[in-house]
């Protein structure tokens, strides 16, 4: 396995090894190898920076299951929601230049933008776009971008039809679509696309020459990881998420060598090249790492009890919490078959980035192992690989119990209220758009018009509820429940994820499809 040392970075010359009494590379390498196996992950790439230098960068495992091509420190991964911090950094640059303020109304730059309420539309600020307290629900609108043909402008337009889940600024609910809206501000303010601003104002100054913002950039690389997921109980390659329509929220592809430069810059309040340059002011560095939204602190499962923080907040593109008595600034990212975690401990000038080509919690397990080693956690220390594996088993057991209870309560002898042909026809949801239900070979088939992957055979469950078994196996199956008018016609259908473990981006619950009347 190849290690890329600090000579790869312009920010430092050859870096010394981590102190032997704190960190043993061979022990950590063995731990990673075990983690790959236990948490069912083909490959990972890891870098650690401290005091302005990259201490090590290294790849582990393979880029694609069943292949021999190894992951190294230059292997590209989709970093998903770790993109959000790049978007807020680019906004901070414009704030420093006086081109916008965090508390400017969004409609100052996007006059046609609307949300669910005129008051919220008028009051919503740039800060609100990136702090997850707009009143929209968790993952609201994610089905607009996921495997869809909608572009960013269309998504920003359609989010006006999303119904609120709470009052404005009253509760935290993570979202992606408003980061897309934030990306739409850049052409109005900077005269450049979000992509161009990130490339010219962030990547180029930091020397991040191996990073990009498009799916084409990622797929054109000869050293890119392949996404993997668990299907039918087996680790398998899954389709790559095309992220061009969500790039400001999750579209960057990078590697740990480039991201180490990013970490060093963030740990030095926006300075780079040994302090000779600046991305953004120290004031903006503080603002981005200041709490903006209070996060709930649920009790973790017993194996992870030690990870319960004393405080948790969301800043501007970053999560803030404590660990081992230090403030920790971090974020995670996840797309189909790809996961990432960036963790910074500002008081220690310490940063860790871990990229993996699976949807497991390996990134978290290895992050906490490194933090324990480098921050001197008291002994005996947790075995985080085992702890996260146990937590996963607990979650899956609970989900299985819920599904079994649902099966036990099902009225399997019930029949649909109508002949199947009466459910067929065109439907429309204000938020998503058009869908269709067709009778094909004696069964109903559901299709989402703007999402070609969403083609599902409707398997009767009970009464007027069916289950959409998507032909693309990596998609989460959904209950589809039809409601009838008093005269026996279909009035609407609504959806809900079948699995309790379904990712929140499968926000079926936000959809309400009604029949489209035939033109007269």
Predicted segments with their positions:
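N-terminal signal peptide c-region/cleavage motif recognized by signal peptidases
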Residues: 14-15
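Catalytic loop of the DD-peptidase/beta-lactamase superfamily, centered on the K-T-G motif
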Residues: 21-57, 157, 187-200, 204, ...
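Bacterial N-terminal signal peptides that target proteins for export
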Residues: 1-6
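Active-site-proximal loop and beta-strand segments within enzyme catalytic domains
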Residues: 62-176, 183, 190-192, 196, ...
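Short acidic alpha-helix initiation/capping motifs at coil-to-helix transition points
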Residues: 176-177, 362
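Short, flexible active-site loop motifs that bind/organize anionic cofactors or intermediates
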Residues: 18, 119, 145, 249, ...
């Amino acid at each position: 396995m190849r290690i890329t040392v600090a000579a790869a970075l312009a920010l430092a010359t050859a870096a010394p090894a981590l102190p032997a009494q704190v960190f043993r590379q061979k022990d950590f390498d063995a731990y990673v190898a075990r983690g790959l196996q236990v948490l069912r992950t083909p490959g990972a790439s890891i870098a650690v920076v401290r005091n302005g230098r990259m201490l090590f960068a290294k790849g582990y495992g393979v880029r694609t299951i069943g292949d021999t091509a190894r992951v190294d420190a230059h292997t590209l991964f989709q970093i998903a929601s770790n993109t959000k911090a790049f978007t807020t950094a680019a906004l901070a640059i414009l704030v420093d230049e006086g081109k916008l303020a965090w508390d400017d109304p969004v409609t100052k730059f996007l006059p046609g933008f609307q949300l669910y309420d005129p008051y919220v539309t008028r009051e919503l600020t740039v800060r609100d776009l990136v702090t997850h307290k707009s009143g929209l629900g968790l993952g609201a609108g994610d089905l607009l971008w996921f495997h869809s043909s909608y572009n960013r402008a269309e998504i920003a337009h359609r989010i006006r039809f999303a119904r609120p889940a709470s009052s404005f600024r009253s509760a935290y609910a993570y979202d992606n679509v408003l980061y897309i809206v934030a990306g739409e501000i850049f052409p109005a303010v900077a005269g450049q696309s979000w992509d161009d601003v990130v490339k010219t104002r962030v990547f180029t100054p930091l020397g991040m020459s191996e990073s990009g913002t498009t799916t084409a950039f990622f797929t054109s690389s000869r050293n890119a990881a392949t996404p993997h997921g668990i299907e039918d109980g087996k680790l398998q390659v899954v389709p790559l998420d095309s992220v061009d329509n969500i790039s400001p929220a999750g579209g960057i592809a990078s590697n740990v060598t480039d991201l180490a430069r990013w970490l060093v810059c963030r740990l030095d309040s926006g300075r780079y090249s040994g302090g000779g340059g600046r991305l953004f002011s120290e004031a903006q560095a503080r603002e981005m790492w200041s709490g903006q939204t209070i996060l709930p602190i649920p009790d973790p499962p017993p194996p992870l009890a030690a990870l319960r923080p004393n405080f948790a907040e969301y800043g501007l593109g970053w999560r803030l919490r404590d660990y081992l008595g230090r403030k920790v600034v971090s974020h995670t990212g996840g797309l189909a078959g790809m996961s990432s975690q960036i963790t910074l401990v500002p008081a220690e000038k310490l940063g860790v980035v871990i990229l993996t080509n699976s949807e497991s919690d390996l990134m978290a397990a290895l992050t906490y192992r490194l933090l324990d080693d480098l921050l001197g956690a008291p002994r005996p220390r947790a075995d985080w690989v085992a702890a996260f594996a146990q937590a996963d088993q607990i979650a899956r057991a609970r989900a299985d119990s819920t599904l079994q209870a649902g099966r036990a309560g099902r009225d399997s002898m019930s029949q649909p209220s109508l002949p199947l042909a009466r459910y067929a026809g065109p439907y429309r949801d204000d938020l998503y758009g058009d869908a269709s239900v067709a009778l094909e070979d004696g069964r109903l088939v559901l299709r989402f018009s703007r999402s070609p992957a969403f083609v599902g055979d409707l398997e009767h469950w009970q009464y007027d509820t069916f289950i959409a078994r998507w032909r693309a196996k990596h998609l989460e199956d959904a209950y589809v429940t039809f409601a009838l008018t008093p005269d026996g016609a279909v009035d609407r259908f609504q959806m809900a994820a079948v699995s309790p473990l379904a990712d929140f981006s499968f926000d079926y619950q936000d959809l309400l499809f009604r029949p489209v009347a035939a033109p007269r």
